[in-house]
Amino acid sequence: MEPTVAPGEVLMSQAIQPAHADSRGELSAGQLLKWMDTTACLAAEKHAGISCVTASMDDILFEDTARIGQIVTIRAKVTRAFSTSMEISIKVRVQDKFTGIQKLLCVAFSTFVVKPLGKEKVHLKPVLLQTEQEQVEHRLASERRKVRLQHENTFSNIMKESNWLRDPVCNEEEGTATTMATSVQSIELVLPPHANHHGNTFGGQIMAWMETVATISASRLCHGHPFLKSVDMFKFRGPSTVGDRLVFNAIVNNTFQNSVEVGVRVEAFDCREWAEGQGRHINSAFLIYNAVDDQEELITFPRIQPISKDDFRRYQGAIARRRIRLGRKYVISHKKEVPLGTQWDISKKGSISNTNVEALKNLASKSGWEITTTLEKIKIYTLEEQDAISVKVEKQVGSPARVAYHLLSDFTKRPLWDPHYISCEVIDQVSEDDQIYYITCSVVNGDKPKDFVVLVSQRKPLKDDNTYIVALMSVVLPSVPPSPQYIRSQVICAGFLIQPVDSSSCTVAYLNQMSDSILPYFAGNIGGWSKSIEEAAASCIKFIENATHDGLKSVL
């Protein structure tokens, strides 16, 4: 691995020993969390010049695993300093010492606060930005901070919206499981080796203990080998010190096909509090697991059947947190996108156009779409796959299907109703049913505006179908190279499916398999802290219905 350490960066390298591994020979997630927290703390103190403590940790997604004998390298640095707190970027890679091949294990962001002596006031110095990537992370740090600050309000709002989904007292159904047997309690006495150099219990050690009890809880449900896939955003509510007794309570909250969420609550007791039974709530965290059987195949978890009101609260909370995680994927774990697209070849226009249409139909037919929002005329669904997030917006429109098709297939009209579109022009009329457009979109997250080159393929219904199709995907056109004024971006698969309800109304479904460049426009809505999708959908409905009332219906 590259040994060079950038200014302000801290590098930790560890050879994975048997003591660091679980029963399957893989690096314990708890051990990795300890190393990550230590490295991040040292990076924070390198910038601040005084002691710092962990305040919170953003979502952590483990993209791979590491095994005994491999080398783990952890790099941490401050991305942005605020008045008395800092965001720390943590990147973990693993290398096989025999082949030299290295892989990314995870990217995480944590927040540290300074711990001055006495009443000393501290104002942190700004971070010196030297590369373009550092400037990007610096801008995104502000967005991530907004997400952290509004997290509790966002969660509360989603919980209020979801109260109608299910009665809190339910009877058992076939193929479901209750969570009573997954409850786990454990206690730890904080000793000097568990404390950091400030005298407080080491934050990474608390994370490791939480991971241990959560793993036991998950194993009681799956009867297999659970492994930690991600950790939800959490913050430390208060400190603990040497001599404290820490009590950990874990229980399964909900399952989502191949994953399970386990909640862990941590309370701290000093000697007096222990005798009185009055502890301090210092942390709550939510850990998401996958599991494999003896053949290393992913296990499908049984659906959870909430019985009590407390079961129901935890069940609904897990659904809300999952939705928020989907929206946070861009701002928490931003990956620099390398724009891709199909190379446009006029001699293969028929094949490329058909691929465009079939991709949209395949996306719509996938199973696993989950509803996130229901309004009077609008329903929003999301589909989470291994490496992709897709959104579907269904709109009930009081206009004939052919009118909606005529309006939505003409992308030059899209800026009239879509607030994200600035301009849209035809640059190649390929055929009567296929056009290539150049599109410019609005600025998001303070970055440069984005532009796209897309193929739009439209299809009227066949005899055995009644669906109008408008599909689009990015293409690479040498005559329209990237411009330094814009960020050339990608549409993987998107479009409209329009079906008549009767002679005067239709259902319009908009689908988009989101690339990293598209996700910023949708992240807030998916995560629950924005209403941009609902607003665009309402604008689309109004645009189509107004056009009908203005006489377009008679023209057609």
UniProtKB/Swiss-Prot annotation:
The modified positions for N6-succinyllysine read 34, 97, 160, 229
Q: In the UniProt record, does the keyword Transcription occur?
A: no
PROSITE patterns for this protein: HOTDOG_ACOT, START
Part of which pathway?
Lipid metabolism; fatty acid metabolism
EC number from the UniProt entry = 3.1.2.1
Activity regulation statement: Allosterically regulated by ATP (activator) and ADP (inhibitor). Cold labile, it dissociates into inactive monomers at low temperature.
- UniProt entry keywords in alphabetical sequence: Allosteric enzyme, Cytoplasm, Fatty acid metabolism, Hydrolase, Lipid metabolism, Repeat, Serine esterase
**Could you give a GO molecular-function term held by this entry?**
identical protein binding
Q: Where is the START domain?
A: 341-550
Q: What is its main location?
A: cytoplasm
Q: Domain of life, per the record? A: Eukaryota
Any one Gene Ontology BP term: fatty acid metabolic process
Q: How does it assemble?
A: Homodimer or homotetramer.
Q: What does this protein do?
A: Catalyzes the hydrolysis of acyl-CoAs into free fatty acids and coenzyme A (CoASH), regulating their respective intracellular levels. Preferentially hydrolyzes acetyl-CoA.
What is the protein's name according to its record?
Acetyl-coenzyme A thioesterase
